UniProtKB/Swiss-Prot annotation:
Subunit: UreD, UreF and UreG form a complex that acts as a GTP-hydrolysis-dependent molecular chaperone, activating the urease apoprotein by helping to assemble the nickel containing metallocenter of UreC. The UreE protein probably delivers the nickel.
GN (gene name): ureF
Gene Ontology cellular-component terms listed: cytoplasm
Alphabetized UniProt keyword annotations: Chaperone, Cytoplasm, Nickel insertion
Keyword Chaperone: yes
Classification via InterPro entries: UreF, UreF_sf
Protein name per its UniProtKB record: Urease accessory protein UreF
Keyword Transferase: no
Chief site of localization: cytoplasm
Coiled coil feature spans: none
Signal sequence bounds: none
Record family assignment: Belongs to the UreF family.
Domain of life: Bacteria
Gene3D superfamilies xref list: Urease accessory protein UreF
Length: 229
């Protein structure tokens, strides 16, 4: 059972107040709005649900693998998989997004003194570190269970997408909350799917999301925009 201290740490990591700049990214959603693929509450809910399925196929199982390697002190494996994940980001803005957020969280870990010195040294030694790798490190450092940490990571992603949809479409606050509430079960299912993929030998990671890649590439030169991705 999650203790009060673990729950508090979990809420801290999943908080929109975490200074990693997540609010400035839409991960292709703004380009989808520009292209009219997303234009109302229903289409926004569908877009975010599909994005969560993409996350469950690669980023979420990778998060679990990174968590296990951080916990076991397998720093070479952490570095190798982190480099692989960065290389799978299909556009410059998506690479910059995960690298900036990862750097910001790694810096916070160092400033807060979270985790063992070896972990902090490994984070500091990376020229670029992705966000799932840094978040998994923080979860290990704070004693958060793997499944709880991944659920928080996934929910924070959904929450940020909802906030982006509210701003970009725009939608009312109640519509945003309906989308968020409607995806509660999907967040849990994503964690289950990720655990199954991470347990495969070799891990079953799929980066297939051509629509996101195309929209992100278009967003890089979009004339007017609110978000950095």
């Amino acid at each position: 059972m999650t203790s009060a201290a673990q729950l508090t740490a979990l809420l801290h990591l999943a908080s929109p107040a975490l200074p990693v700049g997540a609010f400035s990214y839409s991960q292709g959603l703004e380009a989808a709005v520009e292209a009219r693929h997303v234009h109302d509450e229903a289409s926004a809910a569908r877009w975010i649900a599909e994005g969560l399925a993409v996350l469950a196929a690669c980023e979420a199982p990778l998060w679990l693998l990174q968590y296990a390697d951080w916990q076991a002190g397998r720093l070479d494996a952490v570095a190798e998989r982190d480099g692989w994940f960065l290389a799978t980001r299909e556009t410059r803005e998506l690479r910059l997004e995960t690298a900036q957020m990862g750097w910001s969280l790694a810096r916070l870990i160092a400033q807060m003194g979270w985790g063992a010195p070896a972990m902090r040294d490994a984070l500091a030694a990376r020229a670029a570190i992705t966000f799932p790798t840094a978040f998994a490190a923080a979860a290990v450092a704070l004693g958060i269970e793997a499944r709880d940490g991944l659920t928080a990571y996934s929910f924070a992603w959904v929450e940020n997408q909802v906030a982006a949809a509210v701003k970009a479409i725009p939608l009312g606050q109640a519509a945003g909350q309906r989308i968020l509430f409607g995806l509660h079960a999907a967040v849990g299912q994503a964690a289950e799917d990720a655990a199954r993929r991470a347990a495969c030998h070799p891990p079953e990671l799929s980066t297939f999301s051509p629509g996101l890649g195309v929209l992100s590439a278009r967003h890089e030169t979009q004339y007017s925009r609110l978000f950095r991705s």
